[in-house]
Amino acid sequence: MHQPQVTRVDTVQTYTLTRFDAVVIMVGLVVGIGIFRTPSLVAANVESEFAFIAVWVAGGLITLIGALCYAELSAAHPHAGGEYHFLSRAYGKPVAMLFGWARGSVIQTGAIAGVAFVLGDYAAQLVPLGPYGPSLYAAISIIVFTGINVVGTIQSKFLQIAMTAIEIGAIAAIVLFGLFGSAEPPPPAAALPPGSAAIGMAMIFVLLTYGGWNEAAYLTGELKDAPRNIAKVLMLGTVILIALYVLANVALLSILGLDGLRASDAVAADMMRRVAGPAGATIVSIAIVVAAISTLNATIFTGARVYYAMARDMTLLPSVGEWNERGKTPANGLILQAIVALILVAIGAITRDGFKAMVEYTAPVFWGFLLLVGIGLIVLRIREPNRALPYKVPLYPLTPILFCVTCGYMLHASIAYTGVASLVGLAVLAAGTPLLLFRRKHTNVDTPPSTAPRALTE
């Protein structure tokens, strides 16, 4: 999520971020609307209140390990392409292009549909539209905001900052009302049927909520005295995130209980309804819908740039890469992206749990490429032993090995504990393999898949 010629651009590096700036940006990148939906799915996959809180702490520690590995890669190989560039250097252009396909067809479109479902779940709290209301809201929101982006829109970093403030404000409200509000204590949680609990599945939803840490690692390129400060930034940011998420989940647990969480599709609204009445539920639902609208708009805006760049790298479907000069947008890419996202919404509507289906759709592909990036760090260390490393991951090779083992387990869990949506995601990834036959022969290895004439400023 995150320039017009498909060439490498060398720029004069400027270091503008203080340690405080970087911590604030990291927290802003990671804190998102997932925390208002995933707790119920985590609760459904753990056996006890202790395990429910423990997985959120574990998720934060895994986030820190991954961010430290990414910090070395982004410092040693600074480039706007991120994972695309790392994969190009470690494995060659075909693997990187397959990642570009995966990002455009699975990861980004799945994220769009997932955000739309969160929007739909909370919009349905305000104006119910029946059992398929969340899916209907999700589809309408994708169509509306794709149309807005086709016409052309200005992305404002101040708008994104405001939305982050709303999200953190909603979390703060959950914590304050949950810990200090008055409500009848929830009943003890019923035992799950044997075999129902799956820590691996719970961790998938937890780590989704912590998503954004891989973007935070790219702060290395703009951080003052990065070799000394990046680890401190990542550790402090992670501690803040763990505190935010653990406090929010303790608050939710204290009001709704484990069974109440398991039964809820809108945990923040249901919690506020118990401690502050319908007015409280309405206010927090409006705040989350507004934040979801902003997130959805930004995700749609950046996602279509992937299709634009893929068309620049491939000879197939060149019209997808056409830039609409009138609206200053990749209109065809936006339309294709919306079609794929709407198909995913339809799949989610059939399963009757759209957000969960979107997580299952994207998780195996996401964790598979994350594993390749982790292995790539070791590959590049071995292949380029004399390369200057502005920042070195601590406890090498233990830290990247631990990261790779975690990614491998998450890849296994995302296939073993999920439904048919995960197989659909893997099938879509496999369908992209023949497209490599249509790649342009003179594209530069450094070309990122998110290259576009106008980048999102967040």
Put a short name on every predicted segment.
Residues 1-40, 44-50, 63-68, 79-80, ...:
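Membrane-interface "cap" regions at the ends of multi-pass membrane proteins
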Residues 4-13, 49, 53-56, 128-136, ...:
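Helix-loop-helix junctions that connect adjacent transmembrane segments
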Residues 41-43, 64-142, 146-150, 155, ...:
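Hydrophobic transmembrane alpha-helices that form the core helical bundles
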Residues 43-48, 118-134, 154-163, 283, ...:
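Transmembrane helix-loop boundary segments of multi-pass membrane transporters
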Residues 85-86, 92, 124-129, 233-300, ...:
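TM-loop-TM module centered on a large, flexible mid-protein loop between adjacent transmembrane helices
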Residues 120, 133-181, 193-196, 234-235, ...:
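Membrane-interface loop-to-helix entry segments
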Residues 159, 320-327, 370-419:
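C-terminal membrane-solvent junction of multi-pass transporters and transport-like membrane proteins
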Residues 361-366, 395-458:
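A generic transmembrane alpha-helix motif of multi-pass inner-membrane proteins
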